[in-house]
Design a protein with these regions (language model features):
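Bacterial Sec-dependent N-terminal signal peptides
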Residues: 1-21
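Conserved, structured core segments of small domains
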Residues: 17-117
């Protein structure tokens, strides 16, 4: 009887594991790349409009959790199944492919859940 109960609970355990995997967060830190022209405004940079459209799509898909800028670094927190998936997703951005920006991607492990207004 105990084995039957365990067998019946197994699918619930597997679903729970998948949900946890879906909840992984990663931080992407953007800096300007070799294509960036310091004599041009951001909107005048090659591939900048495409970059903005790419990030807009990720926001609409609820992939981006939040974004911020500090100094010359842009930061987004995004959801992905694993680090490799996060990197692969971000490198679909034509601005990264053409080195308008550089990006570093790291696991983002929350230790304090605050709130933003």
């Amino acid at each position: 009887m105990k084995y039957i109960v365990l067998f019946l609970l197994l699918p619930l355990f597997m679903i729970g594991q998948e949900s946890e995997k879906e909840k992984s967060r990663f931080v992407a830190l953007y800096t300007i790349g070799s294509l960036w022209d310091t004599n041009k405004a951001p909107n005048d940079q090659a591939y900048f409009k495409e970059h903005s459209a790419f990030l807009s799509k990720l926001r609409k898909d609820n992939t981006i959790v939040m974004g911020a800028r500090y100094g010359d670094t842009g930061m987004i927190v995004l959801k992905a199944t694993d680090l490799e998936a996060a990197k692969n997703l971000l490198f679909e951005d034509v601005a990264l492919q053409n080195q308008l920006f550089n990006v570093e991607v790291h696991p983002f492990n929350v230790f304090y859940k605050g709130c933003f207004d």
